[in-house]
Amino acid sequence: GKCNPSALFQAPITTSISKEAEKLAQNLSAEVRGSDMLIIWTDCDREGENIGYEVAQHCLSKRRNLVVKRARFSAVIADQIHRACMNLVDLDLHAVHAVDARQQIDLRIGAAFTRLQTARLVPLLHVDRMVISYGPCQFPTLGFVVDHYRRVQAFVPEPFWFIDLRHKTDTHSSAVEFIWDRKHLFDEHIVKILHGRCKEAVEAQVTCVQCRPTSKRKPSPLTTVELQKNLSRLTGMAPKKILDLAEALYQCGLLSYPRTETDQYDNDFDFVGLLDKQRQDAQWGALVSELCASAAGATVAPGALKYERPRNGRKNDKAHPPIHPTAHANDLRADEKKVYDYVTRRFLASCATDALGEETKVCIEMGGETFHTSGLFVKDTAYMKLFTYEHWSNKSIPEYRERQRFRPSTLTVKQGCTCLLYTSPSPRD
């Protein structure tokens, strides 16, 4: 029937068992008749707590004296299941009511604004029997998409100019590119004046040569957002599909619970025990054995991997640890293997050390303008032997000395153009 959309904010809400869940409810009713205790084993997040409460309420309606307890775990593995069973707790009613409140807010806002939009917009569109729905989560996201689209459409590329200085030596096959410290300017005339001063100077002079140790940080503990973002970029899989596959692997006992924003491990987390389960793997088993030997205090051979506890982040939801492998896996399907391999390699790499190198920075001056370049010598790729999704390569440059003078092999003005830092939307049909 018809009603004022605002009335839906006060209308009573009724709950019932859906047709799809009727057999499940019947099964619970039958099982609870001869039971004294109900243990809730749903996922250990707010949604799982709410579902567990619904199950408990249904069972209590059939057996009032039933004892209800909650098992908390993060992975479907024997150790955690036994520990959860020995440390049963009560349901967290705060989490239950929080989900109830969110569901009611979503329902009321969605129903009210859907009715309002449909009533006001359908006559303007001259269509019949059309519903224009509103979702409290989806609508703001749609706003981001529209805003992004408008920025892309409004973007106007702007030309800029810069000085391109290169130096070719007999010791290296390719010329060294020196980056202008001003980067670029939007006034061609000014750039040409500065370029002219450089040409008048004829020679460039080395003003500074600095060598310093540098490193590339190993990956941090894995959260849901990082898993979806990085693996989607690496494989092209949709973020939802990645999470669905991770949940399937969790249900098989191969991964920990994949819905977590925690990037910190507890102090008593058993890293070595999980590493030991991966020693049999044909791809990374030998490298994991090096980590295990290092963790046990054995003398590490030159070039071998060294164990180091993962570096903690800043977030801890106190519910689940970061995503990690809980068992070794064999015979996975193609996409499942991509998800499992990424999670496992990232966990293993987080237990190794940072990659180490030495960076050389060279600064020069020519005609009052300053330029710089840098070289890199990688000493130890460390964690990247396991985390093959990242690379760090040597960048060789000639040996320069302070106050050394040389003539550039290239000294020109080049033009560039500003561009969007994100991909433009594909053409519409």
How does the language model describe each region?
Residues G1-F113, A304-R309, R407-C417:
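Intrinsically disordered, low-complexity regulatory segments
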Residues E31, H58-K62, A84-L91, L107-R115, ...:
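Conserved, well-folded catalytic cores of nucleic-acid-processing
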Residues Y250-Q278, E308-A327, D354-A355, K361-T373:
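Catalytic phosphate-handling regions of large nucleic-acid enzymes and associated NTPases
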Residues T42-C44, K229-L231, R259:
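Short glycine-centered, acidic/aromatic-flanked micro-motifs in structured strand/loop junctions
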Residues S426-R428:
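Hydrophobic heptad-repeat coiled-coil signature
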Residues G1-I17, R129-E247, Q251, W284, ...:
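Long, highly charged, low-complexity internal segments
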Residues M237-L305:
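Extended, well-ordered alpha-helical scaffold/bundle regions in very large, multi-domain proteins
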Residues Q80-F160:
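C-terminal or mid-to-C-terminal helical accessory/interaction module adjacent to the motor/catalytic core
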